[in-house]
From Swiss-Prot:
Pathway: Nucleotide-sugar biosynthesis; UDP-N-acetyl-alpha-D-glucosamine biosynthesis; N-acetyl-alpha-D-glucosamine 1-phosphate from alpha-D-glucosamine 6-phosphate (route II): step 2/2; Nucleotide-sugar biosynthesis; UDP-N-acetyl-alpha-D-glucosamine biosynthesis; UDP-N-acetyl-alpha-D-glucosamine from N-acetyl-alpha-D-glucosamine 1-phosphate: step 1/1; Bacterial outer membrane biogenesis; LPS lipid A biosynthesis. Acetyl-CoA binds at A382, N388, Y389, S407, A425, R442. This is Bifunctional protein GlmU. NCBIfam families: glmU, PRK09451.1. Its cofactor is Mg(2+). Gene3D superfamilies: Hexapeptide repeat proteins, Spore Coat Polysaccharide Biosynthesis Protein SpsA, Chain A. The lineage of its organism: Bacteria, Pseudomonadati, Pseudomonadota, Gammaproteobacteria, Enterobacterales.
Length: 458
């Protein structure tokens, strides 16, 4: 394996017309992340010193989505799409003689660092490392031509003879070569072929005619080199990828009720004896402690969940923290900035945002708690609302320990309710409540004399 610096070229200029979308093909998501982001992340994990992104169709949108997250990218425009060789030619002024150059594709998202490390290690001095795969049905792919067992060239499907079309080893397009060599070969490319395009694959024959060795390497899994040209292929690749992730988690001790009905769209850390029911989606950065139970249909995004937490079905949690032994749902929602301390409970149809629920506190039913600091051992009655927005600004509600808030109460912020206070059902709180105080603001109940119920007109 070479000790030289590694430069990675990512080809991402294709329009993707078969996606039938205004979104550039490489920006379509797989497992919650744009396909091209998977490729860039892999290149970064390889320790690439420079990454050149060749873009074309939808370039402004591509730069808008990626430039901030991937500041070191070198953006290279391919104004006219004339083949893979032409795409890499656009980087000629960027490539250095003393580095190795690895070619990747923005629509081949699942290529792994392990496979690429093997490819880099296999590149012979002065030659090419080429990633190939053997398919039962190689229709549509460029075939690997061998002479005396050695790779001698690649012939594209449309240029292949009937005999060559019987070859089952195909080109993935992924290769690595020295900068000085690949620059020379790129300068020799022509478009004298059935497509009238500049094929990157032609450099294989050039290397062979120079007496250079081409070492072929195959990926660990075939899914690593599957490309995406339409939504059907993307959906199939998504399910294959999710199945692989589910199997990995099962082998690591996570209980998945059905591995075919689980989606992981980010990074997942977990403790022991975690149990996840069907149709659960984990997004972003998710951390689950020991013995966490997640019911069917839940969505967790960028969350930290403590030990022994039970999350009942159809609960949605985003950018929040839940401490040990808390319970949520069913149908609860924690929006960004929410936090539950130990042994807290958020029940059905309770929504929290920028709010903290203290140790042992409970909000069991049908409540909205926004911009609120709630102490320990507080009971929030059904239908309670913290009225945090005055039409222009948000305001805080502070609730001390051991407070009891009766059902159907409105707490108009900014307001503070002291420790041990009791709020009667149906009360609208507009002023601070002292410690231990009992308040009630609903009108006195009285009967209406001589009242009769209306009767429907016939």
């Amino acid at each position: 394996m070479s000790n030289r610096a590694l430069s990675v070229v990512v080809l991402a200029a294709g329009k993707g017309s078969r996606m039938f979308s205004t979104l550039p093909k490489v920006l379509h998501p797989l497992a919650g992340k744009a396909m091209v982001q998977h490729v860039i992340d892999t290149a970064m994990r390889l320790g690439a010193s420079r990454i050149h992104l060749v873009y074309g169709h939808g370039g402004e949108l591509l730069r808008e989505r990626l430039a901030r997250q991937y500041a070191p990218l070198n953006w290279v425009l391919q104004a006219e799409q004339r083949g893979t060789g032409h795409a890499v030619q656009q980087t000629l002024t960027c490539l250095r003689d003393e580095e190795d150059v690895l070619i990747l594709y923005g629509d081949v998202p699942l290529i792994s660092p392990d496979t690429l490390q093997c490819l880099l290690a296999a590149r012979p001095q002065g030659g090419i490392g080429l990633l190939t795969v053997t398919l039962d049905n190689p229709e549509g792919y460029g075939r690997i031509v061998r002479l005396n067992g050695e790779v001698a060239g690649i012939v594209e499907q449309k240029d292949a003879s009937e005999q060559q079309r019987q070859i089952k080893e195909i080109n993935t397009g992924i290769l690595v070569a020295g900068g000085e060599d690949i620059k020379r070969w790129l300068g020799q490319l022509t478009n004298k072929n059935a497509q009238g395009e500049f094929y990157l694959t032609d450099i294989i024959a050039m290397a062979w005619h120079e007496g250079r060795k081409i070492n072929a390497v195959q990926p660990t899994r075939q899914t690593e080199v599957e490309g995406v040209n339409n939504r059907l292929q993307l959906a199939r690749l998504e399910r294959l990828f999710q199945r692989e992730q589910a199997e990995r988690l099962l082998l690591a001790g996570v209980m998945l009720s059905d591995p075919d009905r689980f989606d992981l769209r980010g990074e997942f850390r977990h403790g022991q004896d975690v149990s996840i029911d069907t149709n659960v989606i984990l997004e972003g950065q998710v951390t689950l402690g020991d013995r966490v139970i997640i019911g069917t249909g839940c969505v967790l995004k960028n969350v930290v969940i403590g030990d022994d937490v039970i999350i009942s079905p159809y609960t949605v949690i985003e950018d929040a923290r839940v401490a040990a032994r808390s319970t949520l749902g069913p149908f609860a929602r924690l929006r960004p900035g929410s936090e539950l301390e130990e042994d807290a409970h958020v029940g059905n149809f309770v929504e929290m945002k920028q709010a903290r629920l203290g140790k042992g506190s409970k909000a069991g039913h049908l409540s909205y708690l926004g911009d609120a600091e709630i102490g320990a051992q507080v009971n929030i009655g059904a239908g309670t609302i913290t009225c945090n927005y005055d039409g222009a600004n948000k305001h805080k509600t502070h609730i001390g320990d051991d407070v009891f808030v009766g059902s159907d109460s409105q707490l108009v912020a900014p307001v503070t309710i002291g420790r041990g206070a009791t709020i009667g059902a149906g009360t609208t709180v507009t002023r601070d409540v002292a410690e231990g105080e009992m308040i009630i603001s609903r009108i006195r109940q009285f009967p209406l004399a001589n009242w009769t119920r209306p009767v429907k007109k016939k």
